[in-house]
Amino acid sequence: MAKSFFAAFLIIMLISSLVDGKSTVGQKLKKKLNQAVDKVKEVLNKSEYMCPVVSSFCKQHCARLGKSGQCDLLECICS
């Protein structure tokens, strides 16, 4: 999945570089791409979504809330 995401990103970057930056189509494409990148960064910065990958993220997230945390499948449970 990471390879296909990277390939799609490269294709989008290629298309955006070919489109003239002054045209409205190029500006709209760049704006949408920036919004998508910002949304991905926002999701990745939330520790509870990283719980299945690394359980320490759940513990850190719950510690910020003043609770103890445990990762249960796809859910971070703070108690």
UniProtKB/Swiss-Prot annotation:
The keyword Signal applies. Keywords: Antibiotic, Antimicrobial, Disulfide bond, Ion channel impairing toxin, Neurotoxin, Potassium channel impairing toxin, Secreted, Signal, Toxin, Voltage-gated potassium channel impairing toxin. One of its GO terms (molecular function) is toxin activity. The keyword Transmembrane does not apply. Residues 48-79 form the BetaSPN-type CS-alpha/beta domain. Residues 1-21 form the signal peptide. It is found in: Secreted. GO terms for cellular component: extracellular region. Expressed by the venom gland. GO terms for biological process: defense response to bacterium. It holds the Pfam family Scorpion_toxin_alpha-beta. Disulfide bonds join 51-71, 58-76, 62-78. Belongs to the long chain scorpion toxin family. Class 2 subfamily. The full peptide presents antibacterial and cytotoxic activities. The synthetic C-terminus (AA 33-76) inhibits voltage-gated potassium channels Kv1.1/KCNA1, Kv1.2/KCNA2, and Kv1.3/KCNA3. This is Potassium channel toxin Hge-beta-KTx.
